[in-house]
């Protein structure tokens, strides 16, 4: 009986050891990817923050009517959701999806969705939520090519009045163990009161290149979301894999203890049988 138990435990030890090898390797890969993603995030964040300041000044000095500032009259809301293509990253994707569900459940008829990432597409399909567009297989270091494609689609939907408000839903990266899901409204822009002591002269007039400025700003914003999302994804995956490796180590310790106890019990039983047999022959 003890022999059968020993065989079963030995199989479990082998299985858990193999799993630990996988989780440890994935943790190391995620650590390397996170380092790269954080560097990319820092570079993009500087560019994005500078562009935000410039755009704010430009918008405040636009006096003519403009749909990107005044709105286009549509009641439809567009949510652009940033998720991952791969899994095994803890609650990274489900937290984003849950935030979207809570946001659109009050007004489903006027809510439209663009999803980025295989996992987001899979979750939305299960929930029966249709999408306007899907973008998958985004590289580990997103480029302006991906950002431009999405930005142009957003501008097309907004300028044609198919949507009246645009929100970006993504995970803001703070540290490997802390990320926060944000829902940021990017269209229409919010105009602030002009500062009394500030004047900027534009040549040519700003109205001539507002569309180009808008597209560049949206590209920078989407690239910033991509950078935060990739860093958050890899941080979540690294934390999840390190946690899985620690759990595997704890399980192996318990299995080793069980194995040694059973083996000791089997040896004791065998000795008792030998002694008992010898006593019976006297």
From Swiss-Prot:
Gene3D superfamilies: 3.40.1380.10, ATP synthase, gamma subunit, helix hairpin domain (1.10.287.80). The lineage of its organism: Bacteria, Bacillati, Bacillota, Clostridia, Eubacteriales. This is ATP synthase gamma chain. It comes from Clostridium botulinum (strain Loch Maree / Type A3). The keyword Transport applies. InterPro entries: ATP_synth_F1_ATPase_gsu, ATP_synth_F1_gsu, ATP_synth_F1_gsu_CS. One of its GO terms (molecular function) is proton-transporting ATP synthase activity, rotational mechanism. GO terms for cellular component: plasma membrane; proton-transporting ATP synthase complex. Keywords: ATP synthesis, Cell membrane, CF(1), Hydrogen ion transport, Ion transport, Membrane, Transport. Coiled coil: none annotated. It is found in: Cell membrane.
